[in-house]
């Protein structure tokens, strides 16, 4: 996920404050579940995100739509936090706040989030094997896979962690072969 560094700098204190609050009040699991569901909901309902990001829409209207849309699904504290973001004019940072908050939770729980791009959908057994290997490689208690299917990779898969990129794609192998042939044929 490529996010503007300024956005991260502004969103981080909100995520950190909510994280600290959730630990203090012993509601981290509820807020984490809310944010995991909210992350999916916002991706599927781009109209809501656009509405909340619109500077012309009043703060009261934004609070009202959040309450009507999400009150039944969210913990009271999560909803209050969203209202604070609206009141402070920071609701447009919601997706970044969610991402940072979840990273803090996963880091605390020794859960690593790993992006995997694949040419074809993994089977259940392939996912299980991949998770086991990644747990060993990353020294993590749990692995959270974020899988995207990209037919342009031709075959294989690409693994992205915070510090590493491991490329097992056929596309990459073909590019390496082409470079090698270019250097060999130039001689």
Swiss-Prot record:
GO molecular function: proton-transporting ATP synthase activity, rotational mechanism
GO cellular component terms, A-Z: chloroplast thylakoid membrane; proton-transporting ATP synthase complex
Pfam families per the UniProt record, alphabetical: OSCP (PF00213)
Compartment annotation: Plastid, Chloroplast thylakoid membrane
Membrane topology (UniProt): Peripheral membrane protein
Keywords, alphabetical: ATP synthesis, CF(1), Chloroplast, Hydrogen ion transport, Ion transport, Membrane, Plastid, Thylakoid, Transport
Keyword hit for Membrane: yes
Assembly notes: F-type ATPases have 2 components, F(1) - the catalytic core - and F(0) - the membrane proton channel. F(1) has five subunits: alpha(3), beta(3), gamma(1), delta(1), epsilon(1). CF(0) has four main subunits: a(1), b(1), b'(1) and c(10-14). The alpha and beta chains form an alternating ring which encloses part of the gamma chain. F(1) is attached to F(0) by a central stalk formed by the gamma and epsilon chains, while a peripheral stalk is formed by the delta, b and b' chains.
HAMAP family: ATP_synth_delta_bact
Role: F(1)F(0) ATP synthase produces ATP from ADP in the presence of a proton or sodium gradient. F-type ATPases consist of two structural domains, F(1) containing the extramembraneous catalytic core and F(0) containing the membrane proton channel, linked together by a central stalk and a peripheral stalk. During catalysis, ATP synthesis in the catalytic domain of F(1) is coupled via a rotary mechanism of the central stalk subunits to proton translocation.
UniProt record similarity statement: Belongs to the ATPase delta chain family.
Full protein name: ATP synthase subunit delta, chloroplastic
Species in which this protein is naturally found: Phaeodactylum tricornutum (strain CCAP 1055/1)
Gene field: atpD
């Amino acid at each position: 996920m490529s996010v503007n560094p300024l956005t991260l700098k502004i969103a981080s204190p909100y995520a950190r404050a909510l994280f600290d609050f959730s630990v203090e009040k012993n509601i981290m699991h509820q807020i984490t579940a809310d944010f995991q569901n909210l992350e999916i909901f916002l991706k599927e309902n781009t109209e809501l995100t656009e509405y909340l990001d619109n500077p012309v829409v009043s703060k009261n209207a934004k609070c009202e739509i959040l309450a009507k849309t999400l009150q039944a699904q969210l913990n009271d504290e999560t909803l209050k936090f969203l209202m604070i973001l609206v009141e402070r004019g920071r609701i447009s940072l919601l997706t970044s706040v969610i991402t940072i908050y979840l990273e803090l939770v996963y880091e605390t729980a020794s859960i690593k989030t790993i992006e995997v791009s694949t040419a074809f959908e993994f089977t259940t057994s392939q996912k299980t094997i991949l998770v086991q290997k990644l747990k060993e490689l990353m020294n993590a208690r749990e692995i959270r896979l974020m899988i995207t299917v990209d037919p342009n990779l031709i075959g294989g898969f690409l693994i992205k962690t915070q510090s590493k990129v491991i490329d097992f794609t056929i596309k990459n192998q073909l590019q390496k072969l082409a470079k090698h042939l270019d250097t060999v044929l130039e001689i």
